[in-house]
Amino acid sequence: MNCDETWCRVRLNNKKQRKGYIWCLINKAAKIVIFFFDEGSRGRKVLTEFLGDANIKALKSDAYNAYYYLDDKECGIEHLCCLEHARAKSYQAWIQGKCEEAKFFLAKIEALYNNLERTYKEHGFTPELIKEGRNSAVTIEIISDIRQRVTQLLSDGIEKSEV
């Protein structure tokens, strides 16, 4: 499952327009897209009440803090962070501040998306072959490099605004 929220202009009870949020939940396997809205709120309560006791094994999202409760083992949902959102944040850090660390992440994500994933599509890989590729030594090495750099940056106390 994928989940994201985005802002939109809302008018509630014929009052003045204001910024509000609409949520989207996608189940690609079942080919289902659900939009949900709760008075324009972006709070965690909107998500937790919508999901309720649904039997969801994993949910992929950006790093917005409303999703952090998914990391709680009691929740039973594995929280997967979206690499595309990480790429976008790295790109933004590079464009706005020429952050050298951002270049590292952009290069690694480029290797995953534009080299490996493009190859899978161009060669018409079956889902089984794509899974093998995504679990290959090359992919694992790239992901390990990213993880090591994130761990290093966190231990060094890099400023939030940089990457």
Residue ranges and their predicted role:
Residues M1-V163:
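Catalytic center-proximal scaffold of phosphoryl-transfer enzymes
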